[in-house]
Design a protein with these regions (language model features):
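C-terminal hydrophobic structural anchor segments
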Residues: 372-378
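Active-site bordering "gate/hinge" segments
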Residues: 1-372
């Protein structure tokens, strides 16, 4: 007998789980992506300069990553190096996406499960696995949305608009960020930082309690970990691809243009999402992969959380439920790093360089919240 969980809620996109059961025993379980996007075919023979505008429509949640990856791929093909001001603003754009995404994942998608409710908006009335008062839970929900909103505002500030940003262009950005606007955004993030830390401390507490109740942190089968990094500190703007072995004692680093030499993509019969492997081995991406790869977050509060995480779970850590704690570390990092950038002048210097389009091949790599994203254009 096949049992379906459909539709899945609190995820990006559309999917279901098919479970094959015989006499009460689970024989197999398949995660099935049910929606064909097809953008690889839609954009064939389209003008190259449309890619940064069209490809963000692939995903409303990660539109920023597609926007920046598309621009980087064209710049690679045209042999363009954007100016320093543009790189700072693009990094801010990626940090805004990280902040907004991780706040959504932690507080809207998974915190309700840890408290035994179906929605963050029901924390105060229905939570059954907490000793907090109704008023305290109401404040948790309100503050969670406040932190998420800071990420939304940061994307708008750096990208021109929140959904489908437009500010990154081939050669740079359309303009800097005025000093007053940067100061207001910095003040909002400075106010959000202690709130984010307080919320993450609470999330950590209820996650530990969940692990103790379950007696496990979920599947802890070893895997390789894939991330786009620069050195050993976070860089969501992307530089090279880095694969850490399951034991943590070996690694491979390679540029985006060589990804087919190392990574293998295989289609599946039961899903529109395929499987990617590294030289025949299972790989994981996303937050836990990045935390396993990094030895230093580069900012003080995030570093304290990273140290706590490594002391508690080791490095590399494999348990599946640890992805969420890793997201919390990145949430704090995104706020701290954005504050640093917003403390610098962002309205001085050239926002873009002139260029002439040319035939060629380009690769654009960024580290999206869900893992490395590569745009490859010819």
């Amino acid at each position: 007998m096949t049992r379906l969980i459909f539709p899945l809620s609190r995820i990006e996109g559309h999917a279901r789980v098919a479970i094959e059961v015989q006499e009460g025993e689970v024989l197999s379980a398949e995660f099935q992506a049910t929606e064909l996007r097809g953008f690889e075919y839609l954009v064939q023979d389209a003008p190259a300069d449309q890619m940064p505008v069209v490809t963000p429509r692939i995903c409303g949640v990660c539109s920023t990553a597609h926007h920046v990856a598309a621009v980087k791929a064209l710049e690679d093909a045209y042999e363009i190096t954007p100016p320093p001001l543009a790189l700072k603003i693009r990094e801010l754009l990626m940090l805004g996406q990280l902040l907004q995404n991780q706040a959504t994942s932690l507080f809207i998608f998974t915190m309700p499960d840890r408290l035994g409710v179906s929605s963050i908006f029901q924390l105060a009335s229905d939570a059954v696995t907490t000793d907090k008062s109704e008023q305290q839970l109401t404040e948790v929900a309100t503050r969670a949305l406040q932190v998420r909103q800071a990420g939304t505002h940061l994307i708008s500030t750096a990208g021109g608009q929140f959904i489908h940003p437009v500010k990154a262009v081939v050669g740079g950005v359309t303009g800097g960020i005025p000093a007053q606007q940067a100061a207001e955004m910095r003040a909002e993030l400075e106010a959000a930082l202690p709130i984010a830390c307080e919320l993450f401390d609470y999330y950590w507490e209820i996650s530990i309690a969940l692990g103790e109740r379950l007696g496990t942190w979920g599947d802890d089968a070893p895997a390789c970990y894939l991330s786009a990094i620069a050195g050993r500190q976070p860089n969501f703007y992307g530089n090279q691809l880095y694969v850490l072995s399951s034991s943590g004692d070996a690694c491979s680093m390679f540029p985006a243009r060589d990804f087919r030499k190392y990574l293998t993509y295989e289609a599946t019969e039961y899903s529109y999402a395929g499987h990617t492997s590294f030289q025949g081995e299972v790989i994981r991406a996303n937050s836990l992969a990045r935390i396993n790869v990094l030895h230093d977050m580069g900012t003080p509060c995030a570093n304290r959380y990273l140290k706590r995480f490594n002391e508690a779970f080791g490095q590399p850590a494999h348990a599946i439920l640890l992805f969420d704690l890793a997201r919390g570390i990145e949430l704090v990092y995104a706020i701290e790093r954005a504050i640093e950038i917003l403390s610098e002048p962002l309205d001085e210097g050239d926002p873009a360089v002139p260029y002439t389009p040319q035939d060629g091949e380009g690769f654009g790599l960024v580290e999206a919240p869900r893992g490395p994203l590569i745009h490859h254009y010819t």
